[in-house]
Design a protein with these regions (language model features):
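Short, small-residue-biased leader/transition segments that mark boundaries at the very start
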Residues: 1-3
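Intrinsically disordered, low-complexity terminal regions
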Residues: 15, 19-26, 33-43, 47-223
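Extended repeat-based interaction scaffolds and adjacent low-complexity, acidic/S/T/P-biased segments
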Residues: 10-11
Length: 223
């Protein structure tokens, strides 16, 4: 599906998955895997595995992320994170290993397609030379097939370039991703930003967690 607006909540009891090519919104998500190429918006997330290529907004009467492993590539904004019981709650922002791997694979595929296009171009030149110098040996059907194959590869290249550009922009822009916690973040929570980790030793309130080139820092929520 492209986008999904779930009026009620979702609880698959760890046996189901919600996936969308765009945004997902719902009242709550419990014990569910959620994947969205866009944003996710809900009232609370409980014991879920979440991956969004956009942002995650958890706000409302409860407004909490409790338990689970939650990734918002472009950032996470929540009222609260974790619980007084110090339940393990993992938040991740920034590009994932899978996204970087996908980008690297696209670049390799582009190089391969470029090589194939170059081969077809060389073949076209040879056919043109044969047509001019030895017309009796010119194979028009084969020349047409080569030209058509090149056109197909050019179309494939255009799609790969579009996809690789989108991923490149996502990886670049996700460097500025932050975690915003309006009320409380509890011990037991962990925030991962690339190779850096923040683990609150006590309850912190009203903070923004952001990455610098050397470390992770906390800022006031209203900054």
């Amino acid at each position: 599906m492209c986008s999904s607006d779930l009026k009620d909540g979702v609880n698959t009891k760890n046996s189901g998955k919600i996936e969308a090519g765009g945004n997902i919104s719902g009242r709550f998500f419990e014990n569910t895997e959620v994947i969205a190429k866009g944003d996710l918006q809900c009232n609370y997330i409980l014991n879920c595995r979440v991956l969004t290529y956009g942002r995650i907004f958890v706000e409302g009467p409860i407004g909490s992320i409790i338990g689970g492993d939650v990734t918002g590539v472009m950032g996470i904004s929540t009222t609260s994170c974790g619980h007084e019981s110090n339940v393990k709650t993992l938040l991740r922002v920034g590009s994932t290993k899978e996204i970087r791997k996908e980008y690297a694979e696209l670049i390799m595929e582009l190089k391969e397609v470029d090589g194939q296009i170059e081969t077809f171009e060389m073949a076209n030149k040879k056919f043109e030379m044969i047509k001019q110098n030895m017309p009796e040996k010119y194979d028009s059907k084969m020349a047409l097939r080569v030209t058509q194959s090149k056109i197909v590869k050019m179309a494939q290249k255009a799609k790969l370039e579009e996809k690789s550009k989108a991923l490149y922009n996502l990886i670049r822009d996700s460097e500025r991703a932050v975690v915003k916690v309006k009320n409380h973040i509890y011990p037991g929570s962990r925030i991962y930003m690339d190779d850096k980790t923040y683990m609150p030793s006590s309850v912190f309130s009203h903070i923004i967690v952001k990455k610098t080139p050397s470390t992770i820092i906390l800022r006031d929520y209203d900054e």
